[in-house]
Amino acid sequence: MFLQGKRILFFSAHLFGYQNDIRLAMESVGAIVDYYDERPANNFLVKGVIRINRNLLAGYINHYYNKIIKETLQKEYDYVFFIKGESISACNVRRLKQFHPEANFIIYHWDSIANNSNAQNLLPYFDRVFSFDKIDCERLGLHFLPLFYTPDYANIPYYDKEIKYDMLFVGTTHSDRYKLVKRIEEQIIKMGGLCLTWFYFPSKILYYKMKIQNSYLRQIPVHTFHFKPMSKELLLQLYAGSRIIIDVQHPKQTGLTMRCIETLGAKRKLITTNYYITEYDFYNPDNILVVDRNLPYVPEKFLNEPYRDTPKEIYESYSIKNWLSSIFY
C-alpha cells in the first residue's frame, strides 16, 4: 500500500460527499488521515459570501484556522493536502508550513482558476499543484491530472430492462446550464425519450444573485430548483436507471467535470458541451456526443445505439486509487 503509515492533514470543503470518498480511499491504501473542512462553516450564508467575497469573512476564517493550527501543533505530518483552497488565506498556509515544516504541501484544483479568485494567491506556498484543467496547467505550469470515479460508480450494473430514463441531468445551476439542458431535453422528448433533470443551487444567496444577472432564469419559478444536494444513494440509483448522462461545463472551464469521469466509471453514454473531451484517451464518439453550446443537436442514432466498452487499462487509469497514486507519487 503506497501510503502505508503516512500521516496526512487533509482539507476539503463538503462537496456532495467527495471529501469522504477521498479520505476513505487514502485510508484504504494505508494513510492515517486527519480531516478538516476547508470552510469554517457549511451554512448557505458562509458558502455564499465566500464565493462572492471571502474577505468579508477574513476574521472568521482566521479564527477557524488558528483553532486547527492549535489542534494539530503537536502532530507530525508527511503531507498537508488541500482540495481547491477556496477560503484559506496565503497567510494561513504560511503558518501551517511554519508549524509543519517537514510536510509536503499539495493542492488539487477541481475547478478552473478563473472560478476561484483565491487560487492564484496560494500557488507559491505549495510544493505540488495539480489541476484538472489543461489550459490552467499550460498557463501556470501546474501538473495536469483529470478527476476520478469511485468504486460506487464502477459497480453500477447495466440491465436494459431496468433503464427508466433515456437522459439524466443532475447538477449545480450556473451560467447557461439550465437553458442548454432544457434544449437538449426537448429534443430527446420529441424522439420519444424519457428525461429527468434536477437543478441545484448551493445557497439562496447565489440563486438570487444569479436571478438578477440572468434574465432567462427570472422566468423560472423558484420551486424548480433544489437547495439541498441530492444524496449519493439516490444519485447512484438514478445512474443505474439511466442510459445517457448530460454534462454542461462552466464556460470558463476546460477541464472535464466529475460528471464526465463518473459517467465513464458507470459505463454510461455522455452528452457534453466540452469539446476538450475529444483529446482524452477514453473518448469514443459512439459513447460521447459533443454538442455545440449555442446550437445543441442530438442525433436519434446516438440515443438508440448501445454503449461500447472502454479498454480496461484506460478505464482503470481514471479510478480514485490511480488518482491518489498520481498525487502522492
PLM regions and their residue ranges:
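An amphipathic, basic-hydrophobic alpha-helix
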Residues: 57-76
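N-terminal Rossmann-like NAD(P) cofactor-binding module of classical short-chain dehydrogenase/reductase
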Residues: 81
